[in-house]
Amino acid sequence: MNLAVIGLGKLGLPLAALLASGGHAVKGYDKLDLVRSSIRSRNIETNEPGLMSLLMNTADSLEIVDDISSAIQGVEAVFIIVPTPSLPSGHFSNEYLLDAIEKIGQSIAENQKIVIDVVSTVMPGSCDGPIREKLESATGKKIGSQIGLCYNPEFIALGSVIKDMEFPDMHLIGQSSEWAGEVIERALGSIVKKPVPARRMNLKEAELVKIAVNNYVTMKISYANSLMQGSILLGGIDIDVVTDAIGLDSRIGHKYLKAAAAYGGPCFPRDTRALTALYEDLGLSGSLSLATQRVNESHTKFLAQRILSAVDRKASIGVIGLSYKTGTTVTEESPGLAIANELVSLGFHIAIWDDEGAGIGSDGDSTKFQFVSSEEELLALVDFVVISRPLNNPSRVAQLLRDSNKPYLDLWRQF
């Protein structure tokens, strides 16, 4: 198939590379000149496992172009993965998406049969509302037998994007018509490593499924964390014994039923807030998603208070793990950063070491913390250590903690 990918960021580039490795002729476009030139030269900065090897093997099948009209020319489907940032209300902004849709629509040839596939996460009602309107206005044609519209969000995590795309639990496809959904299902089917169930439905159903899935996961995390809080206050309870037993019930299961740090990252928090905002728009309470948010926010404060009760007020505290998960340097709404900020607000000096090499993003204040380059340097500086997420080499950290005899709190109980 002849395909295009618009937006070559952390998700778009892996998808483009996978489609190109799946036997398709793929054209990729990003509005940033530096991104395009870096990909052309295969000289990109990434720690996404498997991405560079894919790029090196797709020199003949992945073409980077300099404008959207060149990307759209002659393709059967275009995948759009541009940012849909969260607004203060919790809703997603469609500004960048609608701009891309307009340019794509204006570039479609008179007799070209094409499917426009929105991969970016959007609010329910977006595809049948402003996105459809913008596309039909730009093309001068109704969505139907010649132009199809699909919504196909990815369920992935940074640090395992390639693996998550190759081994998904399902392909979720919202479709304007059967033929449009078939085109997208066929393209996605070429990149998976095992048979995957596809669920094709109308556009609004798929939009709701995307944020509902992530809301269920965050609800499960907050449920486990609320149990942890109660267990600590009750005393004499091993929370892992409790959640292990609960997870054996087939109606519940063990996945994400782990009491640890608060949830974070670029997807979980914003999808949870979006469902709350949606329910408020509908005149419903949205109490479950709102409660999930509130438990998550209170959990970091609860953990900080437990640390406060265990150390001297003049103690220096080290935080190991700044990125929101193992395998990435992204710190967006990371639990480690949240704990560090909370401890600073309580008056503690905070030193940070991250085994992924993460630093504070552009939206954070790095001057509040002391960054160190190794575990040994951290342990030499602090009186108490907090481990905020799973580590790449927990046994090494465990040995260093034993040797230093430093007290610590491992939120994930890795050793």
Regions found by a protein language model. Name each.
Residues 1-415:
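Structural/interface elements that position substrates and couple domains in central-metabolism enzymes
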